[in-house]
């Protein structure tokens, strides 16, 4: 195994995936690359962070090629998360059937993100995680502050708290309960996170 696999900071493979929104991308090449990345993750039992932007059908097809079809002989469950999920109900259930969890970040804090917010309100505990995608996907408060010239749009890891508050509100629970649910789901999807969360802040820092 490569030495990097022994580093507790290495918790999975990603972000990998397909993007059907950005113009000029070689989609055939992207699919070939993702296919090989999925094979690496399967063979090395690595969790995945998967980018899916207007490419759910193609992504699900590649997952079936590599991991098999859920409920069928030979199927291997997939660990990891679908980053910034914004798909249909059918796509939601399809990704969950593989064993993946769905990620929600800054977009869930916007009142206009109706479908995203509904997904987050309906999903069972253990099926969703929180993320920031720093420095992208700013939460609503940062966007509003930016409009007033009081902040940048650069998202920071601490902004996950705003997503957690939104999750609690949408799910009708407390902030502590929502945070605990998201934390447990994240550790289940990326088991080495539990090791990383126990490390002292000074771990890995170079000394003068």
List each model region and its residues.
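Intrinsically disordered, low-complexity Ser/Thr- and acidic-rich flexible linkers and loops
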Residues: 68-76, 141-150
């Amino acid at each position: 195994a490569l030495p990097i696999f022994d580093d507790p900071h290495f918790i999975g493979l990603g972000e990998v995936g397909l993007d059907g929104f950005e113009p000029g991308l070689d989609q055939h090449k992207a699919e070939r690359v993702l296919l090989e990345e999925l094979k690496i993750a399967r063979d090395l039992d690595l969790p995945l962070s998967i980018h899916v932007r207007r490419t759910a059908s193609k992504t699900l097809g590649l997952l079936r090629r590599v991991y098999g079809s859920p409920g069928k002989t030979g199927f291997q469950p997939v660990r990891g998360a679908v980053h910034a999920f914004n798909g249909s109900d059918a796509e939601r259930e399809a990704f969950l059937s593989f064993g993946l969890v769905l990620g929600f970040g800054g977009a869930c804090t916007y009142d206009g993100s109706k479908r995203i917010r509904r997904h987050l309100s309906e999903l069972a505990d253990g099926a969703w995680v929180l993320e920031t995608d720093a420095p992208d996907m700013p939460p609503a408060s940062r966007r509003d502050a930016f409009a007033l010239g009081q902040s940048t749009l650069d998202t920071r890891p601490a902004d996950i708290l705003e997503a957690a508050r939104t999750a609690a509100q949408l799910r009708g629970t407390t902030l502590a309960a929502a945070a605990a649910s998201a934390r447990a789901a994240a550790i289940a999807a990326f088991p080495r996170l539990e090791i990383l969360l126990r490390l002292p802040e000074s771990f890995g820092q170079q000394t003068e």
